[in-house]
Amino acid sequence: MSEEVKNSVETEENKASKDNATQAPNPTENHNTAQETEKAENSEKTESATQENESLDKLKKDVTNYREQLLRTVADFENLKKQKEREVASVRKFADESLIKELLPVLDDIERVLVNASKFLQASPEAQSYVDGVKLIQQNMMKVFEARGLKRIEAVGTPFDVHLHEALSQMEKEGAEPDTVIQEFAPGYTLNDKVVRHSKVIVSK
């Protein structure tokens, strides 16, 4: 009977020893598991960093593209603004051209009156105030015209210029160089450097 008990006790001890051996942690397995976990974490970190870098690169490219588009838009706007300013300036520059052309014959009449004023004054000295009034009108008209860019073309004594003068005839004149304006019948004018009326002249042969 004691022999059976002894065997039973040994059997239980062996079983417990096996169970303990099975349950005891393996240091090698634990080390491998820790390495795998660390590798997985590092891999995730690397992947995350790569994604962040890619996102940052894309953002930089987008910013560069937007900046270039903005600069092009600003440049286009500035060009359009300058073009419109030039157009407005051009319109303003020649807006009065048609009106001035219509008033030039009136100015011619005033000048003819003043040229013949001496005859009027000889016959009627009291007409001096009338002549002075006409002179004042002429001066005021010229101030208005000149403020808008009107200038009288030089004629008598200058070389004939087909762009500025209209030759009514030619004649010989002693001491005058050929193709020189020797007489002016009607003055010519430029408006902001554009000829609005040629001078009507006689040219020397």
From Swiss-Prot:
Polar residues bias locations: 19-35
Predominant location: cytoplasm
Alphabetized PROSITE patterns for the sequence: GRPE
Compartments reported by the entry: Cytoplasm
UniProt keyword annotations, A-Z: Chaperone, Cytoplasm, Stress response
Cellular component annotations (GO), alphabetically ordered: cytoplasm
GO biological process, one term: protein folding
Presence of the UniProt keyword Zinc in the record: no
UniProt keyword Chaperone, yes or no: yes
SUPFAM superfamilies named in the record: Coiled-coil domain of nucleotide exchange factor GrpE, Head domain of nucleotide exchange factor GrpE
An example molecular function term from Gene Ontology annotations: adenyl-nucleotide exchange factor activity
Superkingdom per UniProt: Bacteria
Biased composition (Basic and acidic residues): 1-18, 36-47
Signal peptide region: none
UniProt cross-references to Pfam families, sorted A to Z: GrpE
Span list, region Disordered: 1-60
Family named by the database record: Belongs to the GrpE family.
Subunit and partners: Homodimer.
Functional description taken from the UniProt entry: Participates actively in the response to hyperosmotic and heat shock by preventing the aggregation of stress-denatured proteins, in association with DnaK and GrpE. It is the nucleotide exchange factor for DnaK and may function as a thermosensor. Unfolded proteins bind initially to DnaJ; upon interaction with the DnaJ-bound protein, DnaK hydrolyzes its bound ATP, resulting in the formation of a stable complex. GrpE releases ADP from DnaK; ATP binding to DnaK triggers the release of the substrate protein, thus completing the reaction cycle.
Protein name as catalogued: Protein GrpE
Species classification: Bacteria, Pseudomonadati, Chlorobiota, Chlorobiia, Chlorobiales
Name of encoding gene: grpE
